[in-house]
Amino acid sequence: MNFLRSTAATLLDKYTPVSHTSTFRNTGQITPEEFVAAGDYLTFKFPSWSWADADSPSKRLTFLPAGKQFLVTRHVPCHRRLNNDFAGDAGHEEALVEGNKGGDDDDGWLRTGSMTSSQPLRVREVRNIDDAGNVGDREVVDEDDIPDMEDDDDDEAIIRAEGDNSNSGKRTYTLYITYANAYKCPRMYMSGYLANGQPLPPHLMMEDIVGDYKDKTVTLEDFPFFSHSVKMASVHPCRHASVMKTLLDRADAALKLRREKMKAGQGSGSEQGMEGLVDEINKLDVSGAHANAVEAAPGEDAEWEEVPHDVTDQEVAIRVDQYLVVFLKFIASVTPGIEHDFTMGV
């Protein structure tokens, strides 16, 4: 299924008529020329990003310049898995639940998850389980009776397995930004590596994707610019334009409000340069943007907060060449474990 989807996406990008008319402010979509301009801005301001070419001329998109087929950044750190670090208390506490008939303890079942809302955690009251699995009576353990682990000498003869590093420890990612002509917006591809430098198996990349996106808007597909097959995690661009338009509109509304406060003497001007832009982008609310975009019917504007429509071109908060900076802010909400800020150090 992923192969068919990847092939169809490649054909769509190649054979969909190319639009050179800018609708950036109205739709959130960009033209190939605007994509190149945004890529030039990104590589100039953030040198960790660079342009790259397809492996062969046959893999190139004809509407993009040779040598500027896609953007790439490497060695982006990812220190934690979302299934462990974004689960709250789930998985860290367990409770023995009695069976429906009120039988013995071994008739019950083990419930994992937080108990903080159901009962207080009594750390000094424990129940012993013997080798046969029988649960003993409750007993209160005195803290003085608990042995100190530091008092025990390590047995040097013990052979400790190194374990599987695939879902623990530091990973790194190579990130790619391509232009999706069928949707007239950027598309992100991600290729992961283990701490030892070995390629991360594609299915394990899903551990670094927010749960709501797994197998829905994030799929495993071949990277279209390589001659050989390389599976990567890719964020499908079907809703990118609507999400981007929302973020741009919110930024414009915030700029208008800030300028009105400045005129009234109630505020001060924002920072200038890249520091100011990154700071403003970090204030944008991305969490609900994608969900609302999905709910909006095709061809209709998503219903966000009321945005003033009298913002002139001279008052836009984010220019089209700064588009990819905002795009990376959105992608960071999909993969919060990957340190995208590492690629955008000011």
From Swiss-Prot:
The active site is at 238 (glycyl thioester intermediate). One of its GO terms (biological process) is glycophagy. Its main location: cytoplasm. One of its GO terms (molecular function) is Atg8-family ligase activity. Keywords: Autophagy, Cytoplasm, Protein transport, Transport, Ubl conjugation pathway. It is found in: Cytoplasm. The keyword Transport applies. GO terms for cellular component: cytosol; mitochondrion; phagophore; phagophore assembly site. InterPro entries: Atg3/Atg10. Residues 242-322 are annotated as: Handle region. Residues 84-158 are annotated as: Flexible region. The keyword GTP-binding does not apply. Belongs to the ATG3 family. PANTHER family: UBIQUITIN-LIKE-CONJUGATING ENZYME ATG3. The N-terminal region is involved in phosphatidylethanolamine-binding and is required for ATG8-PE conjugation. E2 conjugating enzyme required for the cytoplasm to vacuole transport (Cvt) and autophagy. Required for selective autophagic degradation of the nucleus (nucleophagy) as well as for mitophagy which contributes to regulate mitochondrial quantity and quality by eliminating the mitochondria to a basal level to fulfill cellular energy requirements and preventing excess ROS production. Responsible for the E2-like covalent binding of phosphatidylethanolamine to the C-terminal Gly of ATG8. Monomer. Interacts with ATG8 through an intermediate thioester bond between Cys-238 and the C-terminal Gly of ATG8. Interacts with the C-terminal region of the E1-like ATG7 enzyme. Also interacts with the ATG12-ATG5 conjugate. This is Autophagy-related protein 3. It comes from Sordaria macrospora (strain ATCC MYA-333 / DSM 997 / K(L3346) / K-hell). The gene is ATG3.
